[in-house]
Amino acid sequence: MISIEGIRSGINKILVLGNHEGIIQSILDFDYLSGKRERSILGIVTGRSGFAKYFWGRKEILIPTLHSVNGFTDLPAQAGLRLNEHNIWLLNLLSGRRTLLSTEEFLKHLPLAYGAALFAENVPELHSQNLIKLGSDSSKLIVGPASVGLLVPGVLKLGPIGGITPVQINESHLTERGSVAVLSASGGMTNELINIATGGGARLSFALSVGGDRFPVLSPRDAFILAEQDPATKSVLYYGELGGEDEYDLVKLKEEGKFTKHVIAHIAGTVSSLFPESPQFGHAKAKADKDRVTASAKREALTKAGFAVSNSFSEFINLASKLK
């Protein structure tokens, strides 16, 4: 698997599928505020060949737009880049039903790419299973579907993670490197955890949203291994929820000695016990169809394994605010 340190030590370039002006501009703002000399976005597939206007600081710039993924292969060379000397990423902003085919096509044309962030929700579950196999077979770092992306402060902003305005980027200190990793399936809660951590004075080593669909390509277990293997990461801030077995995979990692770093965790969804039948919450997996996957059972298992687990979200905020 790709390492976070490998991302930091390389030059990262992004190819975008789909035209979402706010997200694209936020990446350019992040690059500019991080003090980079050049933008990280190489080009955008919009369905037509030409250029799109964006801003680099106060200066207006033109970014190449392409008719299809086929045109991606020429962009690195046109920009004077050698693929084996740069980390090439895909930011896929297309709809759920187009996510699989377009990601496959991208990796077919750029097999040396580092990985991808898949933004769309409601990717068909069969497509998600194929994406998981694609990620495993290719050893790429792929977050999503239904992910706000991947952030390595001062280095890479792959998606809307952390916010899409310069004010959000500055106030969350997204350009400053630190030692706290933020991990969650939820995109909204990933951004909230970033605000909580940095608002308390901590700075991030990296942050990622695994993705809110039922079958994410990168599992929470994989994300924790990334944090364990990252020398800059000292602590992990994790937000989970009822449903699924992910937290038991984390317990196993801890018990086997494969994860050793400090974790502050919150598992949401204890309110489900107040209903005659467990309700379906916002994310696809957020439903406790058996006692083992209730929020209370997961909290207990994580606590026994040695994780610092909060009993309320206010307690979670208090614990997180003490991270430095």
Give residue ranges: language-model regions.
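Catalytic-core regions of core metabolic enzymes
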Residues: 1-324
